[in-house]
């Protein structure tokens, strides 16, 4: 087994592949955070003991 200098340890992805995965992970985190923010706002608005 030879070492591929284009691969990043320990994932075995290339730098471009790792950057693409990271970009999608950040996007997913932002979408999840936005949905959570909306859900928390709706829960706060709908519960009488908080308002």
UniProtKB/Swiss-Prot annotation:
Pfam families: LHC
Primary gene name: pucB
Periplasmic topological domain: 47-51
Subcellular location: Cell inner membrane
Protein name: Light-harvesting protein B-800/850 beta chain
Membrane side Cytoplasmic: residue ranges: 2-23
TM region positions: 24-46
Main location: membrane
């Amino acid at each position: 087994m030879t070492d591929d200098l284009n691969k990043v340890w320990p994932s075995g992805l290339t730098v471009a592949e790792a950057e693409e995965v990271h970009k999608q992970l950040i996007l997913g985190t932002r979408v999840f955070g936005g949905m959570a923010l909306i859900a928390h706002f709706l829960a706060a608005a709908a519960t009488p003991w908080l308002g």
